[in-house]
Every structure is written in structure tokens, then in C-alpha cells.
Amino acid sequence: MTAGAKSTAASPLPERVLGIDFFPGKLDDAIERAAGGGLLTAPSGPGLAYDLVREPAYRRALESSDIVLTDSSFMVLLWRLRTGRHLHRNSGLAFLRIWMNRDIMRRPGAALWVMPSEAERAHTLEWLRAQGFPAEPESFYVAPAYGDGELRDERLAALVRERHPDVVYLAIGGGVQERLGHYLRDAVGYRPVILCLGAALAFMTGAQVHIAPWVDRIGLGWLWRILSNPSRYSVRYARATRLAWMVFRYGIEAPPSRYTR
């Protein structure tokens, strides 16, 4: 069983940027399409600028995603400057705010939450219960520290097969969660909704800095993160500046890999 039926409306043609096919439609359309199951990713500016060229498994995960959201406001701006075309921005946070209001999320056992630490597991469990979601400790999995390259986590895959959730939420960070989601989609034997939205959940629960809807809407969530923890996020987002050169140099084409391992 999946989280809902697929939309019968014709899907808009994807917009290819740097070899990745982004979903160009409105957020409601993305949500309805995602409800049919599959892998949803929302690459950040730093992810596109760095991981896309340095981690082949990350690139493959994005290339094979069922839906890729236009989460990066910087990428959307660059694309408009390069092509003159308006690419509608759909952030992972805006997606999650709407998704959490779907009836499926109120069903016991419907979601499995994959968390980066025991502390975040406990915090998220408390928040979900406070919001009226039927979350239980058994609905969580604390991920180990994953390495580079293709990922495998048979313990997690077995848990998904056993519990058969409609939704698997991966909150373990960009660059890693996409590779894990790619593995899970092909390993579990059915088609749950796999949401690789990482920190979007932490923005809602308070585990990370709160990002108000208006801040997200104007594309300044990155600035809020930097201001909340400059030492942690300044270097990360500085990497995204390379995205400008990549978009203007390669356009729709995939940039060459700089894989060095």
C-alpha cells in the first residue's frame, strides 16, 4: 500500500539542470505525485555544487529519483539568469509542512523515521506526540555513520520490509540520505514514499533553527542557518557559490565528475 493514488493529471515535463531532471510544477502537484510512492529528493545548493561532482553515488541517486524538488533558491535564480525561464521553487520545508497534514500521517505505523542520533530521535518523538501524531519508539531507526560511495543498510531494509510503512522519512543529512533512499527504494520489495528532506523536519521540531514560512518563501533559509551557527554552516554554504559557474558553464548538461577516491 502507498500513501495515496497517483494523480491522473498529466505531469509537467521536467526541467533539466546539470543533468538532473527537476520537477517544474506547483507544490500541490509534487505532493500528489509523491503520494504514489518512490524516491523524492531535494538537493541543496551545496549538494549540487559539491556532492554532484565528487560523489558518483549521489549523482546516480538524483538522476534516478522519481521527483527532484527545486529546493535551492540559488539554483532557481541562476537558471532564470542563464535561460530567462522561470523555474518554480518548491522547498523541502514547504513540501513537508503540507505533507504532514495528510491523513496518512495520522495513521498508526504509517511512517518510519530515520534519524541521525538518539538525541534527535527522542526530540522528534516528543514533538510528534505533542502535535497529535501516533508516533511510537518502534517507528524510529537511528542510522549508523555511513561512509562514502554506494550505501547498503540491510538492517534498515529488513525493518522497512517488516513494518511496511507507507512513508519512510530520511533525516540524516544531504549527500547521504539520497544515497540511502536510492538503495532502499530498490531493496524493500514494494514502493513506499521515501522522503529525503533531511533538516526540514528539524526546522519544524526545533532541533535546528526555526525557519518561518515567509523566510523559506523568499529563499533565505540558508542565511538563517548561517546566523544560527556560523562556524558550522558558513563553509558549507560558501561551497554553493561554485554553482554559479557550473550552471552558466554546463546548463542542462551533467558536469564532469571530480571523483578522486
Predicted segments, located by residue:
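Short, flexible loop segments at boundaries between secondary-structure elements
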Residues: 142-148, 190-228
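A short helix->loop->beta-strand "cap" motif at the edges of active sites that frequently abuts
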Residues: 37, 108-109, 189-193
